[in-house]
Amino acid sequence: MIEKTTDNIDIQETNLIALSPDLLNTLLKDHTTSQNGIQHNIFWATSDYEHLGIGYEYQSPILPELITGNNGNVVMPRVLKHKVTQTMRSHEMAEVFTPSWICNAQNNLIDEAWFGRKDVFNKEITVADGTNTWQVNEEKITFPEGKTWKDYVRENRMEITCGEAPYLVSRYDTTTGEFIPVERRIGLLDRKLRIISENATTSGEWLK
């Protein structure tokens, strides 16, 4: 079962900048407008933070100092925000999030088509209380004739929705905040990382 906790779902930007300032800068970079060696950051694109003062306006760029240190809790997952804020954003911005079990079911359809068989990474189940979940396939993933693990990793995948990208990575259920252990994750990227871990024989090969 999925672990019933929200304690560790928020990645603290203060910890991130301590680990690697370059990494945080890369995450904040607007890859569309940054050109000729000049970086432009993504902007807030919301008025929700304007009450915090200068730098938090709708079109202001998100700078590291605005979300770290004493401001380390400014950015947080939607599920950890106040319920009134969540409801308001749903009504005003059509902000809706998908349960992990639905993300898993739809990602499974993609893999069923690619592998030519069902239940490659996990099997969808419904428990006695009606909860939808999944049972992980703990065996090493095998590949159909004519396809290799590198083919799978190189396959292009795109999430057509926006927000917290639950179809790509699944650290937690975006609707409940429940943390999902690594071995149970169901995102498209999660699956590729599992395949790499099962097949790469050296750290250099893993990092390619």
Residue map of PLM features:
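Class I S-adenosyl-L-methionine
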Residues: 2-208
